[in-house]
Amino acid sequence: MYELNNFESIKIALASPEKIRQWSKGEVKKPETINYRTLKPEKEGLFCEKIFGPTKDWECHCGKYKRVRYKGVVCDRCGVEVTKSKVRRERMGHIELAAPVSHIWYFKGIPSRMGLLLDMSPRSLEKVLYFAAYIVIDPGETGLTEKQVLTEKEYSEAIEKYGSGSFKAGMGAESVKKLLENIDLEELYKDLRSKLKESTGQKRIRTIRRLEVVDAFKHSGNKPEWMILDVIPVIPPELRPMVQLDGGRFATSDLNDLYRRVINRNNRLKRLLDLGAPDIIVRNEKRMLQEAVDALIDNGRRGKPVTGPGNRPLKSLSDMLKGKQGRFRQNLLGKRVDYSGRSVIVVGPELKFYQCGLPKKMALELFKPFVMKKLVEDNHAHNIKSAKRMVEKVKPEVWDVLEEVIREHPVLLNRAPTLHRLGIQAFEPVLVEGKAIKLHPLVCTAYNADFDGDQMAVHVPLSVEAQAEARFLMLAPNNILAPKDGQPITTPTQDMILGSYYLTIEQEGVQGEGMIFKDHDEMLMAYANKAVHLHARVKVRRKLHPEDKGRLVESTVGRFIFNEEIPQNLGFVDRKKDPYALEVDFLCDKKALGKVIDKCFRKHGNTITAIMLDYIKKTGFRYSTQGAITIAVGDMEVPKEKGELISLAEEKVDKYEKAFRRGLISDEERYEKVIETWSETTEKVTEALMATLGSMNNMFIMAHSGARGSKNQIRQLGGMRGLMANATGKTVEIPIKANFREGLTVLEYFISTHGARKGLADTALRTADSGYLTRRLVDVSQDVIIREIDCGSQEGSNIKALKDGNEVIEELYDRIVGRYTLEEVIHPETGEVMIGKNEMILEDMAEEICALGIESVKIRSALKCQTRHGVCAHCYGRNLATGEAVKVGEAVGIIAAQSIGEPGTQLTMRTFHTGGVAGADITQGLPRVEELFEARKPKGLAIISELSGTVKVVETKKKREVIVTDEHGESNTYTIPYGSRMKVRDGEFVELGDEITDGSVNPHDILRIKDVAGVQNYIIKEVQRVYRLQGVDINDKHIEVIVRQMLNKVKIEEAGDTNLLPGSLETIFKYEEENARTIAAGGEPADGKPVLLGITKASLATESFLSAASFQETTRVLTEAAIKGKEDHLIGLKENVIIGKLIPAGTGLKRYKNIALNTEEVAQEEIEDTIEEIVEENL
């Protein structure tokens, strides 16, 4: 066996017959499996112990040798080696075939590799392989040609004409094998290379395809005849098990059935050959053997699949690898682990931010080995066995030991679906009674958890290293910021916001207004004795230190209480001018709390922020309870103006109806006007309602503070529900005039059910689509890791605010903060350098840049990074989750994929109907994001200008045309289809690639017309537009990482003197290296153009075959990799997970591999140094 961390790469190739025999421990000759009486494997059968090893540890088949002392002895009676039964998982057998058969992957795949090598169509090849036609192997002196396919009739005619010995022709895989053996790869390669220079069109494409296959065989050392099998490997029996069920029957893996068919047919064929049976019978048997082997390798690839009982297709070797239940995704990429449990979660408001409540029973089971070891150490038990018994009987001393064991031993909590890395965090367990896990309310946002029956899983990090990583990297207080936008994700929600808002409200004319207190405690006492109201403005003397005389500060009682544990130097108050004022002297709604937490984190870091968060949680819950803010039907007052507004609208609608009937306006116009009228009316009713509700109305407080509900929902409760959409998403022109306070009529209720159901169906679809999008994004970007500090790139992006027309999608501030500059940023007025070259732009600098009106800044960008297999820290910028520069080893690709995929569920699924004009529906929401990342041609294409120049609009009765003329007098004419909306006016100047009509642009056109930078900016802008429209903030750099992966390939147009093949895709780095090498040798470099690949294509085009195979199209990827003899250098993360190595990111990087922990000595030295320092200071 290989030592896991000792090999650097894994290679895949075709197996030669010699290799298969070398793997094998013996030939399987009989189709028998297990003897039904003795239940022992049959000799020379599919489960034979002589070939595959003993079924019981250290025991041979006949029972002559038992016990471990005979280890390695081969029994002289039954021939079984005495060893562990585990070898039945790794020992292989083989079947010697009586006639060669072709391997279906290489004959039937698209394109057919065998067909390309022999230059035959797959159809004629199939006829030969399945004994329906003859193929000429050696034409001799006859008029036939090599590889000519003859029918039965033509063959007999040729024999009559030329005589039986004059030429050689045959059928089946044997003949194909002879032809493959005859191929001279070197000659064929040279021949195809010269043909390539002359051919064009379809012929050229075919030649390129053949050249690819020939090149693959030539370089990999595979021989073409190995695509034909003389001998078949039999996989170890434990991987195709046979188990006895209760009723004495057996359940067996489908593979055994498939192997049995192969063995039966093979044995029959051997017998027929020995008997010298007639040709036609032998031929039929050979065909059946070929079909049996096909079914074993890939059932259902050709013809009807072989079915088992109940017409279920049998699972072949290929099916074992494919799909979600296949070997890759089920067992290699995700495994079930020990030391884990799951239970329902309940809220634990009394917990500290870094704690979670773990049920006692669960903790005892999870920490069993630790408890047992500790019991022995503390002399409660003599040995491990008795300790185990104690734990199982749950003796009282076990609980005390458990308390000790779990102290400072973090556990991981995970909630499925884990959409981003905050779906798994570490906490210190606190033992609780009952069976439910207790969760801190502030981490719910990150987990997207609520307490309506959600379940969570617990995992125990076992090794010291794992515990250290859990504590330093995954503990909840270390994950305060969300990686997608760097904003705090642990902001209080619901009750906590409500309490904080209620606490910081200011009211006039309430009890105790204007009172003056000597200190904070006196004010609290007055409040406790109901002498002063929580919302009253009072004056309190504040002191900075005990000796300070202090100063009277005016604010409300609630705000004094709120500020108790909030650091007083967050930057809301200028402390130089006013050292005594309250830091948070404003109404605290959701946004304000977010700001407070953000400033606290940037200024004081994790620990202080965690303490402050716990305080806000505690006071929030307390005062939302004391405030007793509830809602009842009475809180919803229907505005008096409502009736009047509705009757006005009805009159308007009647007027439009009459105008339509008289033919003054079209139905389309009438519909638009009716919708507009009702929308306006709904708005007016809402405004009236908001004016009716006072600022102290409970419903208003809940919505205004951001705790729960929105203006829209209040409108439905107390205003009017307004317009609803029907099943197709078109707005129904009959509005719902009532609200929930008044109650709906039957018709109104019926109209509103459409939209409600569509919403539910949408959500379900969206979740699945969003998950699949995330999976593809992760796959394309999983090997993007920060590899170095600075790649030294001199290129970057010129960043402006993202605009769509006049509407700002993303401000300049958001786009530059936390990035490195490419050039110096100069002050526009003074001309001095504000930020040097290659420096990070911090918040205050970014604010200053925006304040000075600087419109564009040149920054380093991941799109232009020169690092291979990843990006460098300077091109990436700040790690949003920590707020500091990103470290080498950070898996930024996966973070990018998660940041884009996780909010995907919030995006809508809708297609926006342009009121039926020209039928151009504009895709929005999730499908639009998918369309962009898959680089598909969008629906509703816009016409774009292929020149920079002046526009002239020509309109005739029949058509509209736009003519663009550039400065050299060249012009392009674009016909505008009827119903399209134009974006340009006569005499306007358009840039290359600008849109002439409304709609979406095909990204491939932008790449063709503009350049790589143009298409990069387009995708970033469009993706940002979709997310920002839904109120989701994602940082540009995440999209940049994905776009970089979509554009890192070049399509070779002309190969020149390089080793590259025309028409093939190569990474930009390989292309540049190969060209540099060729130019240095004095040759002609290759010519290639950049291509934009969708994320699925880009994932499959990755250099790692393991990663691609585990993603999609497993058999196709493996077929290609085997022929090319590909080597996987295990650079990305997936490959290493599959192999079972540590991933090469974070602490799994090579540079951290051989670090030895020398803790005790170092700690001792440090303690001594510290003592010396203290002594010196005090002397």
Curated annotation (Swiss-Prot):
Residues given in the record as Zn(2+) 1 binding sites: C60, C62, C75, C78
Enzyme class: transferase
EC numbers on record: 2.7.7.6
GO CC terms of this entry: DNA-directed RNA polymerase complex
Molecular function per GO: DNA binding; DNA-directed RNA polymerase activity; magnesium ion binding; zinc ion binding
Cofactors (names): Mg(2+); Zn(2+)
NCBIfam families hit by this protein: rpoC_TIGR
PANTHER family: DNA-DIRECTED RNA POLYMERASE, DNA-DIRECTED RNA POLYMERASE SUBUNIT BETA
Oligomer status and interactors: The RNAP catalytic core consists of 2 alpha, 1 beta, 1 beta' and 1 omega subunit. When a sigma factor is associated with the core the holoenzyme is formed, which can initiate transcription.
Family to which this protein belongs: Belongs to the RNA polymerase beta' chain family.
Protein name listed in UniProt: DNA-directed RNA polymerase subunit beta'
Native source species: Alkaliphilus oremlandii (strain OhILAs) (Clostridium oremlandii (strain OhILAs))
Organism classification: Bacteria, Bacillati, Bacillota, Clostridia, Peptostreptococcales
The encoding gene: rpoC
